Design a protein with these regions (language model features):
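Short, solvent-exposed loop/turn segments at secondary-structure junctions
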Residues: 11-13, 37-39, 80-81, 105, ...
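Structured beta-strand-rich core segments of catalytic domains in phosphoester-bond hydrolases
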Residues: 30, 36-119
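Conserved beta strand-loop-helix elements of the APE1-like EEP
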Residues: 33, 66-84, 203-236, 260-262
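Short proline/glycine-enriched turn/loop segments at secondary-structure junctions
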Residues: 63, 215-218, 245-249
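Surface-exposed cleft-lining segments at the edges of enzyme active sites
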Residues: 87-88, 114-131, 155-161
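Low-complexity, intrinsically disordered Gly/Pro/Thr-rich segments
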Residues: 235-246
Length: 263
């Protein structure tokens, strides 16, 4: 079964018409969004581009949960049935992540949309715990996983993952080698060495794609904070990072697209 996945930090969706048009143009079966507020949820639902929509604002929150401006949203076409699965007892995960079980005939997936704390302000104290908790939860999942994430990292997305640099060492539990899921862009590059060689020629220290520009104009640093990750065994046939298109539509993060082949 072939599946088209979109993952995007929509920055609250300040321009819903433009951002929804860009998403619609990609013909995604499943959409994983981050930094989603109630107005963005309404815009996605009212667009009727997807038949099923779930978001962190609808789910019960545990005591102590922080009500953030941005949550997460997962939407799917009519072929899929969505049921929430992320345990709400973990305060940090419940406020920054959304997980659902998605079924289509005999196929079943665990879908996650995750919005990691930044390495600045209050997020700096939360970041290590978030990645540790997420890695622990991922290790308990028995169904194949598709994860869309604004990880606000790594600090350096090196072509050799062993040379990537992290804001906190716990990031590697989710994003590094040996994690429960694999980066679809690195999987795609493994099967397209000529494309990897071309990228590394211009960016020998990374990033492997542009998804976010950190710093001030004129002195910005290209970063790849956004990614789609999958369980081993899920094949990747195409990956695209639509940075310029996403910025024109109203975000400051790339829209990440992946075409997957399920066994």
């Amino acid at each position: 079964m072939r599946l088209r996945i979109a993952s995007w930090n929509i920055r609250g969706m300040p321009h819903p018409t433009d951002q929804l048009r860009l998403l619609d143009d990609q013909h995604a079966d499943i959409v994983l969004l981050q930094d989603v507020g109630p107005s963005a949820v309404r815009a996605v639902a009212d667009s009727r581009l997807w038949n099923h929509v779930m978001d962190t604002w609808l789910l019960p929150r545990p005591p102590g949960a922080i009500i953030r401006r941005g949550g997460c949203l997962i939407a799917a076409t009519d072929d899929w049935v969505l049921l929430p699965v992320l345990p709400v007892q973990h305060v940090l995960l419940s406020s920054r992540s959304l997980a659902v079980t998605a079924t289509h005939r005999e196929a079943a997936l665990t879908l996650l949309s995750c919005y990691a704390p930044t390495n600045a302000g209050p997020g700096r104290k939360e970041r290590s715990g978030y990645f540790s908790a997420l890695a622990a939860w991922l290790s308990t999942v028995s169904t194949p996983i598709v994860l869309g994430m604004d990880a606000n990292g790594p600090r350096v997305d090196h072509p050799d993952i062993e040379q990537s640099r992290w804001w906190t060492e716990e990031e590697a539990l989710v994003l590094g080698s040996g994690a429960q899921t694999e980066d679809v862009l690195r999987l795609w590059y493994a099967n397209h060495p000529t494309e990897l060689k071309r990228r590394v020629r211009y960016y020998p220290n990374g990033p492997l794609a542009d998804s976010y520009h950190r710093g001030r104009k004129g002195k910005c640093l290209r970063c790849r904070y956004d990614s789609i990750r999958v369980s081993p065994g899920i094949s990747v046939t195409d990956v695209r990072y639509l940075y310029e298109e996403a910025v024109r539509a109203g975000s400051d993060h790339a829209l990440v697209m992946a075409e997957l082949e399920l066994a």
